């Protein structure tokens, strides 16, 4: 009987962002690189993680359902101003990448699943995860991260900029 049950307790778990991720985001921001989070997580959870990562000074979050209500003409400015896109599907990811590109931005997109393949292919630089990534994601991407570490992208950009500066 439901009424004779006794509540014993509750457990909460958290997987906090790694220090390396926080440092990598800070390095991106210092280098003028804007990082967006596109996730299937709940909006409040994603926004809390974005704040822990210092993704933006005041990270704005939007759900895929809210994104569906945005007119195509308004999407580029929304994509520019929103830091976190939560509860998204593959079509949302693709719309976000295209909207950022329409702003003249060079877009690097990371992903590991079959559902990421269309946006990895659309991005200027698709980056798949080498360890946990699916074959579909790896085939759609231009680059595969052998160690699945976001900080590797930051290091690659830094190295590329150094080479570019030395050539000039």
Predicted regions and their residues:
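Cytosolic catalytic headpieces and adjacent flexible linkers of membrane translocases
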Residues: 1-99, 103, 117, 131, ...
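Residues at the starts of beta-strands that form the adenosine-phosphate
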Residues: 34, 106, 125
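Non-transmembrane, extramembrane segments of multi-pass ion/lipid transporters
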Residues: 73-76, 101, 121-125, 131-168
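Short helix/loop capping segments that flank catalytic or ligand/cofactor-binding pockets
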Residues: 47, 108, 153-154
